[in-house]
């Protein structure tokens, strides 16, 4: 036995332990789910490693998890004969949190116990959940392939530090003993433990056993009672010990599917929906796919691991097999069990493999089908999904050309038709409501819903009763650069180029517009001469009715929102000048047209331009100059 060493917990571990003890008291029984899950994973990992090194079994290939309790001592022990851990592995896995984005996770803590509980569940508490019910935890472990005298003893009270020392342990695997707090002794009760184990372990493919005490013999009685022989204590199987996904769907209850989701995702909440599918023929595989009810806290972390659990012929191969799911569906949880991949498959082999490509195509279509069915049959439930994952789904049209139209059909937007900020209008809804003669889907992208809904660019369209989709999420500009049409209808920005109403504009309106442009030629020239190269062009508007002026981007130029996105990303943006549109029928523009003093004319022109830029961009390059000019104009008007 080596000298005992004391190590300090990583700062994040201390924070997590504190948060768990204070936030998870209402979900305290999940400690058993987490520890049984870890034990089953250890068995799966040994089974996989032993494919190429059978000696790791050490003559004991019957993998299992065993749970026992000692009521007198107030302890619960979870033991497995899986892969085990080395001394370095113990220090690494039981003293640190090796997760990217950990600091961001702790920033998201609100102090609200119910919200923090859910967040901790998404983060995944694993081994540390032991301290929800225990004031001391002892771990004895030996890694497969290592000698008995290379085993390790780890112990901690869940405070600032833990101790590690080398011990002798004959059996392979890990044994975790929880020394229960005085107010948590209920978990040392056999009946209580059995009910939890049954709830959390029935779907696990590794046998989960619990020790059942023997009973003494009972002699026959004179009244005719039969003698009952003594029974010996033994380990009793507590679960079906068959992989849930290998069973027929009709034999699996909703509760079992829900518990299996929690087992693989470490989530506390039930999934929104799931799909269990078995395919036979040219390719043979089983998939079990889940859509969570809530988005993970680190969904936007680029380093976040995602993907499905991969099994080959029911043997666990790897977690987070991202090759089977496109990035825009990274929220999907579940597994795929293939009969066509080699057991020694690696991530590198998966990258360039025909089977992988075919499976990815199939499971992607299945997820999209799940969402299409949900959107059709339960709009309220789909709206809940969209609120959580809509922004991620908007990455789809750029990433998945083959399914672009299907993904587009799942998108939801706010609209002038509903008059509310909730994004609940589909492109199909829009097309169904299009006016006779309308050939385009009109939209606007702005910084906020309010900015989009109140934009002057919508004035003529509102007057004509033409619906406009209102987009205000950062990803929307990226989206519409890749989603240019739907159902044969072009998507058209109301802030770029000409409005192009086509047949929505009758002959008399076109004639009136042409007359107005002819009458305003002099004004347009004067304004362009006054503003010079601040604008690319000046023209009479086709979109304003109540506002004096607006700016629009050229047809082939970047929109205001795209420029903002690129600047925020630190990228150089090519200089572009807006087109300045005037509404000659507005009193301010009429006043401008009557102005004979060229200096005053230039000031009015500049003021209208700055107003239009402020309305479009939400800010000005030189706000002080704008205020100074406006004050000059106000003073002049009251003299």
Swiss-Prot record:
It comes from the Bacteria. It is found in: Cytoplasm. Residues 348-564 are annotated as: B. Residues 1-347 are annotated as: A. Keywords: ATP-binding, Chaperone, Cytoplasm, Nucleotide-binding, Stress response. InterPro entries: HATPase_C_sf, Heat_shock_protein_90_CS, HSP90_C, Hsp90_fam, Hsp90_N, Ribosomal_Su5_D2-typ_SF. It holds the Pfam family HSP90. Its main location: cytoplasm. Residues 565-639 are annotated as: C. GO terms for molecular function: ATP binding; ATP hydrolysis activity; ATP-dependent protein folding chaperone; unfolded protein binding. GO terms for cellular component: cytoplasm. The keyword Iron-sulfur does not apply. Molecular chaperone. Has ATPase activity. Belongs to the heat shock protein 90 family. Homodimer. This is Chaperone protein HtpG. It comes from Shewanella halifaxensis (strain HAW-EB4).
């Amino acid at each position: 036995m080596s000298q005992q060493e004391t190590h300090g917990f990583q700062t994040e571990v201390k924070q997590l332990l504190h948060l768990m003890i204070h936030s998870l008291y209402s979900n305290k029984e999940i400690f058993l789910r987490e520890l049984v899950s870890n034990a089953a994973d250890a068995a799966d990992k040994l089974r996989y490693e032993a494919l190429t090194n059978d000696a790791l079994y050490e003559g004991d290939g019957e993998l299992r998890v065993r749970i026992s309790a000692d009521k007198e001592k107030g302890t619960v022990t979870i033991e497995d004969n899986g892969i085990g851990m080395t001394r370095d592995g113990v220090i690494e896995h039981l003293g640190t949190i090796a997760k990217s984005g950990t600091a961001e996770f702790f920033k998201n803590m609100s102090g609200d116990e119910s919200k923090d509980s859910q967040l901790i569940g998404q983060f995944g508490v694993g081994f540390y959940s032991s301290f929800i019910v225990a004031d001391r935890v002892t771990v004895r472990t030996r890694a497969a392939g290592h000698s008995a005298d290379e085993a390790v003893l780890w112990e901690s009270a869940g405070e600032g530090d833990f101790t590690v020392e080398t011990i002798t342990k004959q059996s392979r695997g890990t044994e975790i003993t929880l020394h229960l707090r005085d107010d948590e002794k209920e978990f040392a009760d056999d009946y209580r433990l059995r009910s939890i184990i049954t709830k959390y372990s029935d779907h696990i493919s590794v046998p989960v056993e619990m020790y059942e005490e023997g009973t003494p013999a009972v002699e026959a009685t004179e009244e005719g009672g039969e003698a009952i022989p003594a029974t010996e204590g033994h380990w009793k199987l507590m679960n079906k010990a068959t992989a849930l996904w290998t069973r027929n769907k009709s034999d699996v209850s909703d509760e079992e599917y829900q518990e299996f989701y929690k087992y693989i995702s470490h989530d506390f909440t039930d999934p929104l929906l799931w799909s269990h599918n078995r395919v036979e023929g040219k390719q043979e595989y089983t998939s079990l796919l889940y859509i969570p009810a809530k988005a993970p806290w680190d969904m936007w972390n680029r380093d976040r691991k995602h993907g499905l659990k991969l099994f080959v012929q029911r043997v666990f191969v790897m977690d987070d097999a991202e090759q089977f799911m496109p990035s825009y569906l990274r929220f999907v949880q579940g597994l795929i069990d293939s009969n066509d991949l080699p057991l020694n498959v690696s991530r590198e082999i998966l990258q360039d493999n025909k089977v992988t490509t075919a499976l990815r195509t199939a499971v992607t279509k299945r997820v999209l089908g799940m969402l299409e069915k949900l959107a059709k049959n339960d709009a309220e439930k789909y709206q809940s999904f969209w609120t959580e994952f809509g922004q991620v789904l908007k990455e789809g049209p750029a990433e998945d050309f083959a399914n672009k139209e299907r993904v587009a059909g799942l998108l939801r937007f706010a609209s002038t038709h509903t008059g509310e900020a909730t994004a609940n209008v589909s492109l199909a809804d829009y097309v169904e409501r299009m006016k006779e003669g309308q050939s385009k889907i009109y939209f606007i992208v702005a910084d906020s819903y309010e900015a989009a809904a109140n934009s002057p660019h919508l004035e003529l369209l509102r007057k004509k009763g033409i619906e406009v989709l209102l987009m205000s999420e950062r990803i929307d500009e990226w989206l519409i650069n890749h989603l240019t049409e739907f159902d044969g209808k072009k998507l058209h920005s109301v802030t770029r180029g000409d409005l192009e109403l086509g047949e929505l504009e009758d002959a008399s309106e076109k004639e009136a517009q042409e007359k107005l442009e002819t009458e305003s030629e002099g004004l347009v020239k004067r304004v362009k001469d006054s503003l010079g190269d601040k604008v690319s062009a000046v023209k009479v508007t086709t979109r304003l009715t109540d506002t004096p002026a607006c700016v629009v981007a050229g047809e082939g130029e970047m929109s205001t929102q795209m420029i903002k996105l690129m600047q925020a990303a630190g990228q150089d943006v090519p200089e572009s000048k807006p087109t300045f549109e005037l509404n000659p029928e507005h009193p301010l523009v009429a006043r401008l047209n009557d102005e004979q003093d060229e200096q005053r004319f230039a000031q009015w022109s500049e003021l209208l331009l700055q107003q239009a830029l402020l309305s479009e961009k939400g800010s000005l390059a030189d706000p002080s100059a704008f205020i100074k000019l406006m004050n000059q104009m106000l003073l002049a008007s009251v003299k």
